[in-house]
Regions:
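Active-site rim elements
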Residues: 1-7, 77-81, 121-124
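Short, contiguous alpha-helical
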Residues: 7, 11-18, 29-72, 109-168
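Helix-adjacent hinge/juxtasegments
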Residues: 59-98
Length: 168
């Protein structure tokens, strides 16, 4: 199918979210980029936003409802990871049953209409943007980072220097 690349991308992007979340510690949840500035989301707020916004986009724009509350009962790091892994896994299973007409069908994107493929692409970039913010938070906390799209400074530097790629 022409849109398999989007499904394949989601399959890896959901794992990248979980990988970044796994690099935080439980006591990091309240940390925000600047402790006295509420404009920068805390790690906890980023996890809430990822779970709630992805659930909302999939239900209201893509017509995929996993039938579960978007947030875990206890909002701990491990519970967020478990909830997101389960729900995103169900979404992935549903995406694998789509066909080309489904992707090309028009759907509401806030106050405009777009194809599901267009909306889904925006969802992927939205998630990637927030994952980048969280990766910056890990760097600010002085943590080593696992590879995301290839080698990082933490895994040996630049690709042209044959740095290894290390995934969590």
């Amino acid at each position: 199918m022409r849109y398999d690349f989007l499904i394949d991308t989601y399959a890896t992007e959901r794992l990248k979210v979980l990988s970044v979340w796994s690099e935080f510690r439980d006591d990091d949840l309240a940390v925000r980029p600047k402790h006295d500035d509420p404009r920068g989301r805390s790690v906890h707020e980023q996890m809430v936003h990822q779970c709630v916004s992805e659930d909302t986009w999939f239900r209201t724009m893509l017509g995929i409802d996993v039938g579960a509350p978007p947030l875990p009962e206890q909002e701990t790091r491990l519970a967020f990871m478990t909830r997101y892994a389960e729900d995103s896994g169900r979404r992935l299973d549903r995406l694998r049953r789509t066909d080309e007409p489904w992707w090309e069908e028009s759907t509401a994107f806030f106050d405009v209409r777009r194809s599901r493929a267009w909306v889904f692409t925006r969802r992927l970039t939205h998630t990637s943007h927030h994952r980048g913010q969280q990766t910056a938070m890990l760097r600010m906390l002085g943590r080593d980072l696992h590879s995301n799209y290839g080698p990082t400074a933490d895994t040996g530097g630049l690709m042209q220097h044959h740095a290894p790629t290390i995934y969590a």
